[in-house]
C-alpha cells in the first residue's frame, strides 16, 4: 500500500503486507481479523448448520482467518478443508512434515495469488492444529470451473469468479466424485457446504481468456 501525504514535497511510501514473520505479526493479524468478518456475516445470514468449509490458501492468511472466525462465531464446528494449487502446496507439505516447509515452485500456478512457496508464520500456528484436511488442485480445472460458475444454469445468478475463487469448487467436485474420500469427509446429499471465493474478475483480460477456454 502506498501512502501520499498532503504536502506535495513530503512524499513517502509504506509497504503493508499480510505475510507474517518472526518480527512482523501485528498487521497480518489485523488482516486475518478482517477475513474473519466474512464468517461473522455468514453466521448471521443462515440458520443452517454448515457441515463443511472449503477455503483456499496461498500463505494461509485467508484460511486461518476463516478458522478463527468459525471458532468465534459458529455454534458448531464444521470440517475445514484447505485447498491450494498442486504447483504451490506449501500448506499441505508443511502439515505433512509437521513444520514450516519452504517448497520449490517449478512452474507458477495460474492461480497467481495462491502461487506461494512458504506459509506465513501466524497462519501456520492456527492451521497446523485446526484444519481437518488439506488438498491440492490442478490448474487444468480452473478455466472450466470459471465458465461453469458464470453459467446461470449452475446457480440462481451468474457468479463472477476469478482464478483464485475456483479452488474450493474444484476440490469439492473432485472429492465428491471419489466414494472413499466422500465417506471419509462425510459428504452427503444433505450436507451444507460453504465454499469461499476470494475474488471476482480482478484481472479482466485473464478472466475473459479463462471463460473462452472453459466454454470450449
Can you describe what each PLM-predicted range is?
Residues 17-26, 140-145:
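Conserved Rossmann-fold dehydrogenase catalytic segment
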Residues 18, 101-108, 146-151:
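The feature captures the short pre-catalytic strand/loop hairpin that immediately precedes
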Amino acid at each position: 500500500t502506498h501512502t501520499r501525504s498532503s504536502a506535495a514535497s513530503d512524499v513517502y511510501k509504506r509497504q503493508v503486507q499480510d505475510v507474517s514473520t518472526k518480527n512482523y505479526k501485528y498487521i497480518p493479524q489485523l488482516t486475518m481479523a478482517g477475513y474473519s468478518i466474512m464468517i461473522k456475516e455468514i453466521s448471521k445470514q443462515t440458520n443452517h448448520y454448515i457441515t463443511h468449509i472449503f477455503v483456499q490458501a496461498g500463505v494461509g492468511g485467508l484460511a486461518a482467518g476463516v478458522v478463527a472466525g468459525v471458532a468465534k462465531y459458529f455454534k458448531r464446528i464444521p470440517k475445514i478443508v484447505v485447498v491450494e494449487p498442486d504447483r504451490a502446496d506449501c500448506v499441505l507439505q508443511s502439515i505433512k512434515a509437521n513444520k514450516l516447509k519452504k517448497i520449490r515452485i517449478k512452474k507458477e500456478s495460474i492461480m497467481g495469488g495462491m502461487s506461494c512457496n512458504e506459509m506465513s508464520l501466524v497462519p501456520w500456528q492456527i492451521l497446523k492444529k485446526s484444519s481437518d484436511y488439506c488438498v491440492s488442485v490442478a490448474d487444468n480445472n480452473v478455466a472450466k470451473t470459471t465458465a461453469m460458475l458464470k453459467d446461470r444454469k449452475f446457480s440462481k445468478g451468474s457468479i463472477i469468479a476469478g482464478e483464485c475463487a475456483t479452488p474450493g469448487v474444484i476440490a469439492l467436485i473432485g472429492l465428491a466424485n471419489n466414494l472413499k474420500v466422500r465417506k471419509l469427509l462425510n459428504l452427503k446429499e444433505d450436507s451444507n457446504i460453504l465454499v469461499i471465493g476470494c475474488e471476482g474478475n480482478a484481472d479482466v483480460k485473464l478472466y475473459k481468456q479463462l471463460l473462452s477456454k472453459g466454454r470450449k
